[in-house]
Swiss-Prot record:
Binding locations of substrate: 7-12, 66, 144-147, 167, 172-173
Listed name of the protein: dITP/XTP pyrophosphatase
Function: Pyrophosphatase that catalyzes the hydrolysis of nucleoside triphosphates to their monophosphate derivatives, with a high preference for the non-canonical purine nucleotides XTP (xanthosine triphosphate), dITP (deoxyinosine triphosphate) and ITP. Seems to function as a house-cleaning enzyme that removes non-canonical purine nucleotides from the nucleotide pool, thus preventing their incorporation into DNA/RNA and avoiding chromosomal lesions.
Annotated residues for binding of Mg(2+): 65
Cofactor note: Binds 1 Mg(2+) ion per subunit.
Enzyme Commission numbers on file: 3.6.1.66
Family designation: Belongs to the HAM1 NTPase family.
Organism taxonomic ancestry: Bacteria, Bacillati, Actinomycetota, Actinomycetes, Micrococcales
Pfam family, one: Ham1p_like
Length: 193
């Protein structure tokens, strides 16, 4: 099944391709500039997907908004994750803010919300989380964003150290894309039954 995936983030595009192809989707990528003015990940994902509606017809349009929520920071950076620091040094700022937080209070989770605008303009949304902790120093060379400082529950290496094959089978983005793919497959199978 062909879908449009809206993103200007090359790392998200790579992950989405690696996740969606085995799920049976042929993603077409569309870069649309959209101000993220929503108060939630879901609101921002909907804004991004709707921004691409005029660009394509008769194909579901999917968009992602995701970020990290740190319990010791009252859920921040949250929807501000990609623009947490003014100079793009998001990890440095996060680690500085967490410098005195003991291990027991370094819990965090990634959130990924996926919005899909159907050809009939109906909007579907799903969200998923990936629980873990914030490390004291970056670890690993893979991934992107906050991956080097996120230690997923049940693992001994950061998300950046997992390798893309494993990360793309357990991450928040994988879980959300899997949920959306199931929803789309059910929708299309019932329409064509």
């Amino acid at each position: 099944m062909e879908i449009v995936f809206v993103s200007e983030n090359e790392n998200k595009i790579t992950e989405a391709r690696e996740i969606l192809l085995p799920l049976g989707f042929q993603p077409i990528f569309c870069g649309v500039t959209c101000r993220e003015t929503g108060l939630t990940f879901t609101e921002n994902a909907v804004l991004k997907a709707q921004a691409a509606v005029g660009s394509v017809k008769d194909v579901p349009i999917m968009a992602d908004d995701s970020g990290i929520c740190v319990d010791a920071l009252n859920g921040m950076p949250g929807v501000l994750s990609s623009r947490w620091s003014q100079d793009g040094r998001n990890i440095d700022l996060l680690l500085w803010q967490m410098r005195d937080v003991p291990d027991v209070h370094r819990t965090a989770h990634f959130v990924c919300s996926i919005a899909c605008v159907m050809p009939n303009t109906e909007v579907r949304t799903v969200s998923s989380v990936w629980h873990g902790r914030i490390l004291h120093v970056p670890d690993g060379t893979g991934g992107f964003g906050y991956d080097p400082v996120f230690l997923p529950d049940g693992y001994s290496v950061s998300a950046a150290g997992l390798g893309s094959d494993l990360k793309n089978r357990i991450s928040h983005r994988y879980k959300a894309l899997r949920l959306m793919s199931s929803l789309l497959k059910r929708t299309y199978s019932s329409c064509h039954a």
